[in-house]
């Protein structure tokens, strides 16, 4: 990633090792799999402040999406150059939103949503999608599904993702006046057309 230095900017675990991420990359030519790593949020804030003025000079963005900021757990970083407790990790992520919304005047959001980010985020992507979507038998990044028609393979997704007897939009009930929420990008309204009307409710 531009703006980051490896391995200096990676979160260090208590034993000094790099914190491995969740999206390993496999080289299609060699078959070798390379792990991904989690960047320390302190370094993320630094790089955000470095990049945004240049980005805004090139394109007049009015909104910005912070990938993973509210989708991952709070971490501890044991690197003496950028140490973090879980509390300071949360505070650093809040500063990223503050920078974008209060200093730059942008609309800013992230994935999944956390209550600690509600005061500083404008929207959360994916809050409306339930775990039944993420647990479906088709890889969630594959678009489109093999079929867009009703399919027994998606019975759990339909039952727990849409059935009003089971689905309680608790996050929206609590924070609906504070921020917007959306379906996950791969679980959008046109993913399964026969369910559009339920997603519009």
Residue spans for each PLM region:
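Active-site-proximal substrate-binding groove within the catalytic cores of carbohydrate-active enzymes
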Residues: 30, 38-64, 68-201
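Substrate-binding/active-site clefts of carbohydrate-active enzymes
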Residues: 1-46
């Amino acid at each position: 990633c531009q703006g980051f230095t490896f391995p200096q900017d990676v979160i260090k675990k208590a034993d000094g090792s790099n914190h491995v991420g969740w999206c390993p990359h496999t080289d299609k030519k060699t078959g070798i799999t390379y792990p991904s790593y989690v960047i320390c949020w302190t370094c993320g804030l630094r790089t955000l402040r470095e990049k945004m003025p240049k980005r805004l000079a090139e394109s007049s963005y009015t909104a910005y999406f912070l990938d993973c900021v509210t989708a991952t757990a709070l971490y501890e970083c044991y690197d003496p150059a950028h140490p973090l407790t879980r509390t300071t990790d949360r505070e650093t992520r809040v500063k990223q939103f503050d920078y974008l919304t209060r200093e730059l005047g942008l609309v800013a959001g992230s994935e999944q949503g956390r209550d600690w980010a509600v005061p500083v985020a404008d929207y959360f992507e994916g809050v409306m999608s339930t775990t039944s979507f993420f647990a479906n038998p088709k890889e969630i990044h594959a678009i489109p599904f093999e079929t867009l028609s009703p399919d027994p393979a998606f019975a759990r997704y339909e039952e727990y993702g849409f059935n009003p007897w089971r689905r309680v939009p608790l996050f929206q009930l609590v924070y609906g006046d504070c921020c917007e929420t959306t379906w996950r990008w791969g679980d959008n309204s046109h993913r399964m057309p026969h369910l559009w009307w339920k997603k519009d409710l």
